[in-house]
Amino acid sequence: MNLSVKLPGLNLKNPIMPASGCFGFGKEYSEYYDLSLLGGVMMKAATQFERLGNPTPRVAETSAGMLNAIGLQNPGVQQIIDHEVPRLAKYDTSIIANIAGSSIEEYEFVAASFNQTTDVDALELNISCPNVKEGGIQFGTDPFMAKKVTEVVKKASNKPVYVKLSPNVHNIVEMAKAVEEAGADGLSMINTLTGMKIHLPSRKPLIANKTGGLSGPAIKPVAIRMIYEVRQQVSIPIIGMGGITSAEDVLEYLIAGADAVAVGTANFQNPFVCVDIINELPEVLEQYGFNSIEDVIEKRGITV
């Protein structure tokens, strides 16, 4: 069965890729399976300089997912270009670089830096990380700022730009339309929901940062709803994410309006989850009357 999907800058052999922040730069997972099996890899966020991240503890398990407040820990964009990208480029899979910053100037610098390499196929513009005290959240929750940073990154980069939207907004459609108008080539959605967990013995937040990003199955219905709403109003492709653990979840996302998907938290529970989903997808598509991924995209919203 044909599982391929063509998106701006991305010729995916299948619509499955690990989400940024849940796969590092693929090194550990490459010891479990051939990364060439994946449609693509969304790399861990890159900033202008090295970041050590937030204080610990910065991860907490929840009843249907997890909270994290990592704080964009990374070695800096040049180290990523020099060391991580060449290693990933050995695999036959698309590479998406996630870029972040605490100012428009930093976003511009990081985006332009990736022009050095032809091995990165597209950028994922992280305007929505909810756990960084400087920047991030302001870009992801204000349509004007989101539009401005998207315009700057598009001008600085020679690669397609997928803007990662935050669900922590009053109107996700307004945000999507703003970045589409700014020239975004696609969207990735949703990022994590802001949450908190209390440590009962101390009566204080369990995470040192107090709040963290909630991910996992708990947020899937929110993601499905938001993608459905955005798909009615924008025409650019959507990479859907949030709580995906199975091929059935993937099909649900595609029907709601996504064109490809990213798997996040589930990688921590099962390092083979992306490969398992890829293997299960043909049978699930056939079960529901589809003969390819493109067939799902063409027929979604149509009840036969």
UniProtKB/Swiss-Prot annotation:
**What is the active site of this protein?**
129
An example GO BP is: 'de novo' pyrimidine nucleobase biosynthetic process
User: What organism is the protein native to?
Assistant: Oceanobacillus iheyensis (strain DSM 14371 / CIP 107618 / JCM 11309 / KCTC 3954 / HTE831)
Q: How does it assemble?
A: Heterotetramer of 2 PyrK and 2 PyrD type B subunits.
Give the signal peptide range.
Answer: none
Q: Where does substrate bind?
A: 44, 68-72, 126, 191-192
Name listed for the protein in its UniProt record: Dihydroorotate dehydrogenase B (NAD(+)), catalytic subunit
Q: What is its main location?
A: cytoplasm
Q: Where in the cell is it found?
A: Cytoplasm
One GO MF term attached to the UniProt entry: dihydroorotate dehydrogenase (NAD+) activity
Q: Which cofactor does it need?
A: FMN
Cellular component annotations (GO), alphabetically ordered: cytoplasm
Question: Which CDD domains does the record cross-reference, listed alphabetically?
Answer: DHOD_1B_like
Q: How is the cofactor bound?
A: Binds 1 FMN per subunit.
Pathway membership, UniProt: Pyrimidine metabolism; UMP biosynthesis via de novo pathway; orotate from (S)-dihydroorotate (NAD(+) route): step 1/1
